Amino acid sequence: TILNSDAYQRTSAKNSKNEDDKYYYSHAYIKPLSAEQFFYSMLEATGFERLQKRRDKNQLESMKRNYLRRFIYLLDNGEMEEIEAFNGTVPQALMMINGPLVNDSGDHRQRGSLINYILKNYRTTKDRMKRIYLTVLSRKPTSKEMTHFERYMKRSLYNDKKLAYEDLYWVLLNSAEFALNH
């Protein structure tokens, strides 16, 4: 019942009637994910459990705890801010650019990686793109995004077009849309 309520279904898109509303909850407010929300979103978007499927459940949970501990350590800004006030840091940006969670899941050659899985199981550019968007942003790409990516694929200098899917995945993971609750 709650999921079907008008309040729960609010969008962050403003219209002419609620553009200046700050008090009456006429639209959802955009806010950064907490550090833990961001971490668990990363685990889902990267397919972490699929990459680690050879491990038993206890090992997997232990790895998650260790990653979470390191993740929160990286996000600590040293000013005793609450972890709920997470707005991103330089170490977080570096982790998103070069970290093993992002790099391992985005490598199309690595068996079990998200991109490898998508390229194996989906044949068309459209289907592959939809799956990447649904996995990372929990939505389908717009027609404008589809057109833009198809144009990117055609103009890409890559000999191996699979690398363009890695780029798309990396860009979506590093987008504001991924890091914000909207």
Where do the model's predicted regions map?
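An acidic, gly/pro-interrupted, aromatic-rich
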Residues: 3-142, 172-182
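Helix-loop-helix junctions that connect adjacent transmembrane helices in secondary transporters/permeases
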Residues: 140-157
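Short, charged, surface-exposed loops that flank catalytic or proteolytic processing sites
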Residues: 156-164
